[in-house]
Amino acid sequence: MTIHSPWETSHSKKGLIDIGTHRLFARVSGPRRKPGDPVILIECGGGSISLLWTGVMRALSPTYRIFTYSRAGLEGSDLPPNRGPRTAVEMADDFEKLLDVAGIKSPYIIVGHSYAGVQIRTWMHVHDRMEDIVGAVFVDTATEYTYPRMPIREPQFWFLMEQIPNPAHVLGYDRVHKFFNKEQWEEVLSTDLGHEEKDVDASAAQLKTWKQFERQIMEDKPVSVIKGYFAEDLRRLCVEAERIGAGTPAQRQYVMENLDSLDRVFEETETEQLRLSSCARMVHAAPGSGHTIVFSDPEIVMNEIKWVVEQYEAKRSIATIKGDLSNITAPPFLLASQSTCEFPSYWAEHPSIFVAPALEPDPKKRALLVLRWFLAALKRQQYAGRDEKEGVKKPLNAFLGELFFAQWQDQSGTTKLVSEQVSHHPPITACYLWNDEHGVRADGFACQSITFSGTVNIKQMGHAILHIDKYDEDYLIPLPNVKVQGLLTGTPYPELVGSYQIACSSGFVADIDFSGKKLFGMSGTKNMLHAALYSADDKQRENPIYTIEGAWNDKFTIRDESTGENVETYDTAANPATILEVAPLDLQDPWESRKAWGETISSLNGGKMQGASDAKSKVEQGQRAMRKQDEQNGSKWEPVFFSNEPRDERYIRLTAVAGTSTEEHSQSGFWKFDKDRAERARKPYHGSLRPDNVES
């Protein structure tokens, strides 16, 4: 992409652009683009101007390049040569000429508000821009079906705008916006919007003939639809109109009686936009935010723009990846803001469920409660504590010697965790989880092998052994394999795969089967599980004691097979995680996760991708230098809290109960919590040495 235009090279620019027949006022801001980087094109709503988007532009422009303009007759743009109502096709022609004259090259991410929903899709079709557009955000947009279905049209509510002295004040738009300083906001209030005439019905009718919803015109490109509340704006104006006597009682009553129907029309027609792409999602603005979301709920607009950019960038990266992912460094936008060293914490987020087996005298029910704990922890483990709608991201690769300490406090007392990265090749995380009040403890270790073949395949090696002091009872806890599906369609989600056993030293085995969403949806359902608890003597698995059916990311039901009754339906949404407690950063050791990755995490959370990349590289380069020094000196890294043993009798006994192989650990050995090492451990754990190989 060779760039010559000042509209592409200037960090910030505004002014009139002559498109031949008239001039249009435009704005651009943001860093210069590299080849393949998208520019965000903002098409304003009906009668709206580019100035109203400058707050969002200012907040996003440190990271993204953004171009917007005001259509003919608005904000200093010339009136069009042909006066009178204009169609979306005529406006699309103006936009196409504008991009050409300004030298704004693809790829484009298009953002439209309100009437711009009709406008930008007309431009896509008329000027054959589908290949150039890599994503879209529709901000409370109208479609070709909105206007014909609306129970209230402009002639029926326009009295509100004409007779109320300051409708912007009633709607709250004249309050200083968080992304504007006072001076900038005064410019917004003092600027003449201008005027444009639109032939809405003709434009909608034309768009309808192209049947874009039926053809999924954006294929698998990311599309976000943000639903606002236009009806709420009209309600507020009606209340004010009644207060000051604007309009007739009949006019006000008609509007008020049809507001619910109006909102349903917007909900239905905006939802239809999800059919434009197989990679589409819909989010709702904050209740009461009204129609002009760029003022009332700007964060949601910014977040959805970021989401679309991230999905596009992810596709660019994924297209170049094949084979083993273990040593591939993910780009920052794909990274989660926590390390793999933190992941054992998700086993402990429900302390009461973790210790519940210690309170149960019946061994069968104890085994069931251990199975319940295992299943209840899966959702937040697989999504790394993120909202399910946000999908999955790659965690930071823990460095050798990385440490993570945490605790949880609730009615069950205090549950604690220590985890440590004990090996680099292969990467192994060891952990120890315990609750002294109830005498429940678990230690384990995990090593992941990650490959890519359209889906990310994560094979987990390792296990945990849960011990209950009161009954001197052990349980072998498996680590399920994972496929991350949907990467190429932009909606990544984890799917557990395979069959596993939880073996109990008291003579019980739980069989667990994860049946994922099969190809083309012909069989199976996403995130489903089936589990059954048996006596270990029931070798043919003919007489289950308890069975469990459901979805590990939603609800699952436990059934007592002896009575045929459902014992419990566990709802993941109704059981929020207990708050995780960690030491303040200034009290953490340099080798603790959040201290060591502090700059990286801060940059990721702040959307500063370059800063995240630089901070991450600093740690990684320091680690490479340390490994090279170890190799030259013939030294071996020694963990602080764990030691490796060639044999674990507990594991051998429990695999015999389950009837599974012991070959998995023949090479790597068994990592176990070492009480002697733990008692000797003192801060600073590695003296003056830091993870970035710089002495403190």
From Swiss-Prot:
Keywords: Transport. GO terms for cellular component: cytosol; membrane. GO terms for molecular function: oxysterol binding. Residues 615-633 have a biased composition (Basic and acidic residues). PANTHER family: OXYSTEROL BINDING PROTEIN, OXYSTEROL-BINDING PROTEIN-RELATED. Belongs to the OSBP family. This is Probable transporter efuK. It comes from Hormonema carpetanum. The gene is efuK.
